[in-house]
Structure formats: C-alpha cells, structure tokens
Amino acid sequence: MLRTSLRSVRALGSRPSAAVAGRQWQATVVRRAAVSGQRFFADDKKPVVPEPSQPAVLPASETLTSPSTPPPASPQVEPTSTVPPETTPLTPPTPEATVIPPVAEEPVVPPTLPTPRKKKGFFRRLRNFFLSLTILGAIAFGGGVYYSRINDAFHDFFTEYIPYGEQAVLYLEELDFKKRFPDVVSRVTGRPRDSGEQVKVPAQSGASWRVASGGEPAGRQSSSIKKAGAAAQDAVPKSEPAVVAAAKEDTAELPKTEATTTATPAEPAPAPAATDASGTPVKKPFKAPEVDEPSRWPPASPIDPLTVNGATDPIVQDLVKMLNDVITVINHDNANEKYAPTICKAKNELSKVADKINEMKAKVEADAAKQVKARVDGFDKAANELVSRVESAMAAQEAAWRREFEEEITRLKKSYDEKVHLIQDREHQIAEEKLNNRLLEQAIQLQRQFTENIKKHVEQERDGRLGKLNELHKAVAELERLTSGLNEVVDTNLRTQQLHVAVDAVRASLEDAHHPRPFIKELVALKEIAADDPVVDAAIASINPTAYQRGIPTTAELIDRFRRVATEVRKASLLPEDAGVASHASSYVLSKLMFKKEGLAAGDDVESILTRTQTYLEEGDLDNAAREMNGLKGWAKTLSRDWLGEVRKVLEVQQALDVIQAEARLQSLRVE
C-alpha cells in the first residue's frame, strides 16, 4: 500500500547517508528487507487507487541537482558493489550468531491502539463507597450539631433521634460557655462556699477596756492582793459563759412578760453571796477606803433593762431583746459607766420607734374602719334601690297579667258565642229537614254539653288564676331571700363575668395572632380570676406547657402545613414497613401517577384519608381531621406525627377553653 511504502522510505531516509555507506551490504540488505516486510494497518479504509504512471517523489531523498529522485531499489536485487576488494572490510559473523532475529521469524506488530480503561475492583469500589459515606455522614452530623444550636425544634429532634447528638451539642455549648465566661470556674472553685453555719464569738474575745497591770504593787499588801487577783482571774474565765447564757435566757423571756404587764422600774437585784452553788465568784459590794488607804471611786450602777409599753410588734420585741442582751453583757463586763449614755440614747430612740409604730397602726385601723363603713353604706343603699326596683317591676307585672287575663276572658266569650250561633244555625237547617222531635232532643243535648263546657273552662281559668297568684307569692318570697344574700350574689356575678371576659380574651388572643404567640399572661389572669376553682385549674393543667409558652398555630397555618405534609405522605403511601431504597424510589414514582380524590372519599387507603382530612380542615373540623390522620400507619403516620402533635395542642387548648366557659356558664346558672 501507499502508506506502507511511505513509512518504509521514511525509515530509510531518517538515517544519514554516511552511516549507511559505512556498513556492510549484507546488513543493509537485511535491514531493508525487515523494514519492507513490516505491515501497518490504516486507520480508515480507503478505496483502492490504481498505481500512478510515474513513481512517487520523496521529499527526504530529493536533491537540487537531479530533476527527479530515483525509485528505491527492490529488496530482492542486490546492488553492485563499487568498493574495491582491497578496502573491503572483514566478513561479519553469520546471521545465526547475530543478535538480530531473522526477518522471517518476526511477528507482525499490530498498530498501537488506545489502552482501554481498567475496571476498578470490588474492594476498591467498596472502600471508596465507605469513605464517601463516612465523609458525608461527618459533614451531615456537624451541620446538624450547628443547626440544632439555632433552631429549637431541630434541636429536640436531633438530640432525641440522632445517636451521640445530645453529647455533641452539650459539649459545644459547654465550650461556648467557657469561652464567654472563662473566670466562672475559677471564681466558683476559689471562693469558699457559705455553709449556713452560725459562727459564735465569745464575749471575752478581742481587746478589753481594762488596763493590764504593769507590775507588782509595792507595800505590805502586795502579796495578799496578788494572790486574790490571781484567784479571781482563774475563776472568771471559767464562769463567764454560764453567766452570759443565764443573762440571755432572762432577756429572752423579758419581751413576753412586758407585753402583758405595765411598765415598772427595774429594781436592783440583791447582792449575791460570795460564791454560788457552782463555785462562781461574785463581786463584793463597794467598801469605802480607810484612812490610811488611797481614795477609790465607787463603781457605777448597772444599766437597767429596757421595757416598752404595748410592744406587740415582733420587730420591736426582737429589738428590745437584742438591746437587753447588749445591756446584760455590758453589765457583766463592768462597762456600764462607759456605755451608759449610748445605751440610754438607744433606749429613747427605740421607745420613739415603738410609739410611732403604734400611732401608724392606730391610724391605719381608723382609715380601714372608715372605708368599711363607707362600703357597708354603699351596699345598703344599692340593696334598697334594688328592692324598690323589684317591687315596682312586680306591680307592673301584676297589672299586665290582670289586663291580659281580662282580654283573654273576653276573647273566649266572643269565640264561644260565635260558635254557639254557628251551631244553632246548623241545627236550624237540619231541623227543617228532619223531624221536630229529634231536632228538639238534639238541641237540648247540645245546650247541656255547652253548659258543661262553659263550667269546665270557667273552673280551669279560676284554678289557673289561683295558681299564678301562688307562683307570684313564691317569687316574692324568693326575691326576699335573694335580697338578703345580695352581697354574695354580686360577688359571684362579678367573678363569673370576669371569668367570661378572661376566656374571651384568651380566645381573641389566639384568633387575632397571625403566627404562634405565647398566651401565658392570659392564662395567669384566668387562673387568678378563677380563685382556686378545681375545674378551671384542672383544665389549665391539661394544656401542654409548650402550647402556652410558644403559642399554637392558627387554622390557616395548620392547613398550609398539612398540604406540605400530604405531599410527603403521598410519596411514602406505597411503602412497606421494612422498605429500602428501591421501595422509596418506586413509591415516589407511583405516587406521581396516582389520581387525587375529592370530598369525603370512602376507603382506608392513604389517599382517601388525606382527602377526607383536607375536607374536614377546610370545613374547620380539626377534631375529625386529627382522627382521620391518626388512622394512618407505617411511614405515613411517622411523617405526619409532628403535624398531629400541633393539632393535638390546638385541640387541647380549645377543649380547655370550652370546659372553662362551660364552668362559667354553670356558675351563672347556679347564681340564677
């Protein structure tokens, strides 16, 4: 073929002529034969073209001196050697010893085709699948954790149904809290907690007002004074807690006795003996110094405890008790001379405070008495007005009933007269046709019946009038009884009216809201107005807390959300319980081919239930719509579970409001 010849010529022409001339003729012939023996396949099949009359001109072997290029020599004809025998190189090795294989044994090399793509192995595809699934799962889990911190509804779903979702969300929230408040943990752990235990400080702790003795006194009495002082110092610290405790007990009982007794001046206690039963040393009475002794000031008298007349207020009693405890401690420490002015000032101020409190109480009681008297006078005036109105209404009603009775008697008499005349005329006409005797007997019989009827009706009207008078008497007695309990009736009517208004306020809040809005304030007001009514409390307790904390959707929102839920339920209407990916795909495709029903379609299939539910929703019947959706099973019920929960919240709120309104009506009927 033409392409084969061109390739062979190119292969030969690609080498330099000097290298070709330097080789032996046999090697050249072998190479040419090998090149010409190779076959190549064309990419496209070409039609067979007849050989040209002139040989093809090769550009590689074309020269400028010759007009044409001679054709290549045939591989079968060996050219005549122009090299002299003397310069002929040595004979090369035989073809069997050469490395080049023989031309006849070389296989035909097919053309190089594009290598087909190697098919991936099963384990490699499985590895890629699990790797992709792991990456997508991690991305989805991270996105769910992030979105659950933004949306509360998705937070509840994610933490409840996704494994380890709650732990991840809590961990991120804890990190966020630590980042925002880094010093909270250190402050909580570093500061000691208040355990609530009371810390008591002894009365003799700290510095004292006494001046410490600087050294031993000089004189003959130094040894005896030293021994007596040492004995007193050893005995006082041991006996002080008992004395202070006894003093506190005495002052604790003081306000109780002072509240019932009049103020009496405190008498000084008699001087105790040198030592009591427990061995506690008691101070000796003051003795005037002798002539040869230095002068001494007598000790100050102890401070009297505080007594307040009419101290019935607990706060004043506590203040008196505290001040008496302080006075007892000061007297025990012999500091009465130092703190006497301050204690006297505190006594005066406390007495003034008690007097002011008593004056304020008296003023408040007087104002309250005036208000109560004004309220009682107002209620009496309203009761008298109501009685007068009731009496006038009763008189007007009695006159109206008497007038109606007389009119009714006249009308009955007239009607019966007309009836009698008509019967007489008919009897007269019949008498003309029949015998006179039969006509007379019939006339007598008719007159007798007429008389009996008249008497009967008269007696009935008389009994009816007496019965109405008895009923009127009973009504008057009932009005008198109601007038006596007017205060209770007014309060009950007011509370019932307020309960109606509160229920209407809750309904108006729910109906006017264009989106879910909390109604906690309305429920709190309704519960306060009910005043511990068990029925109202039970109705409010039956409402889901999320309903009045976040609000409930309106009917339009429920219908809009039902349309979206119905679309998803129709896609999963043909799914079995253990459906796979193929079942989901087939159910999605088949749901597009199903015909939609209208109205109250019969049947228990998903499409019929959805059609009936939509019809009930358009009619405003949420109860039947929820019952229809509750009848779904499998994936359809799972997809509609959230919508059913919202409808249940709305129905619970409506049912609770209906119960409260019925209770209010029942209270109104009881009052009536």
Curated annotation (Swiss-Prot):
Primary localization class, coarse: mitochondrion
Entry keyword annotation includes Transit peptide: yes
UniProt topological domain (Mitochondrial matrix) ranges: 49-125
Residue spans of biased composition, Low complexity class: 58-67, 75-85, 96-107, 257-281
Keywords: Coiled coil, Membrane, Mitochondrion, Mitochondrion inner membrane, Transit peptide, Transmembrane, Transmembrane helix
InterPro entries given in the database record: MIC60
Compositionally skewed regions (Basic and acidic residues) per UniProt: 247-256
Coiled-coil region: 403-489
GO biological process: cristae formation
Subcellular location: Mitochondrion inner membrane
GO cellular component: MICOS complex
Bilayer-spanning residue ranges: 126-148
Membrane topology label: Single-pass membrane protein
Bias type Pro residues, positions: 86-95
Pfam families for this protein: Mitofilin
Organelle transit peptide residues: 1-48
Region described as Disordered: spans on this chain: 43-112, 189-305
Residue intervals annotated with topology Mitochondrial intermembrane: 149-672
Family: Belongs to the MICOS complex subunit Mic60 family.
Biological role stated in the UniProt entry: Component of the MICOS complex, a large protein complex of the mitochondrial inner membrane that plays crucial roles in the maintenance of crista junctions, inner membrane architecture, and formation of contact sites to the outer membrane. Plays a role in keeping cristae membranes connected to the inner boundary membrane. Also promotes protein import via the mitochondrial intermembrane space assembly (MIA) pathway.
Subunit structure: Component of the mitochondrial contact site and cristae organizing system (MICOS) complex.
Record-given protein name: MICOS complex subunit mic60
